[in-house]
């Protein structure tokens, strides 16, 4: 839960001092910008939260996958600012943490079947979300020096 709790602040720290242009830049061709990474984690947070709620509060509700690239294409049309994306992530993460903290050990052991991955428990999602956070935080850590070193657009 430590990773889940600290990720919003890590986003803030890693984006500090970067311009809107830098947050939207693609220093590695074909890879997401920092803004897109945070948007992706925000979309994922929504999907993971729904799955966890189904596991915790419904009986035998099937869990479905999602196409991250299609969600990203839709998000790009919305033209959301980085601050709004970050605030949306923080609000959803607070709700997710509240849900996990309110769950008993028996609740966290409840399961549902994912259409791609099979049986998953609510506690599996704590680890899955943390790993997803770490993966993308490391991606931002690698991108940041490239953005700082590049000439401003």
Residue ranges and their predicted role:
Residues 24-68, 97, 111-153:
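Short, contiguous alpha-helical
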Residues 3-8, 12-14, 72-109, 129:
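Acidic/histidine-rich alpha-helical segments that form the ligand environment
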Residues 14, 18-21, 59, 103-106, ...:
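A short secondary-structure junction motif
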Residues 6-29:
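A glycine-rich, hydrophobic loop/mini-helix early in the fold
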């Amino acid at each position: 839960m430590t990773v889940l709790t600290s990720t919003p602040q890590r986003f803030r720290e890693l984006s500090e001092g970067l311009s809107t242009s830098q947050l939207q830049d693609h220093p590695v061709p074909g890879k997401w910008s920092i803004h897109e990474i945070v948007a992706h984690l925000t979309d994922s947070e929504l999907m993971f939260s729904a799955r966890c709620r189904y596991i915790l509060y419904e009986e035998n509700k099937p869990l479905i996958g999602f196409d991250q690239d299609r969600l990203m294409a839709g998000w790009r049309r919305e033209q959301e600012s980085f601050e709004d994306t970050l605030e949306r992530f923080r609000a959803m993460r607070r709700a997710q943490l509240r849900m996990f903290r309110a769950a008993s050990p028996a609740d966290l052991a409840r399961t549902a079947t994912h259409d791609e991955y099979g049986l998953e428990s609510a506690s599996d999602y704590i680890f899955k979300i943390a790993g997803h956070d770490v993966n993308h935080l490391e991606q931002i850590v690698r991108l940041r020096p490239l953005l700082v070193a590049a000439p401003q657009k």
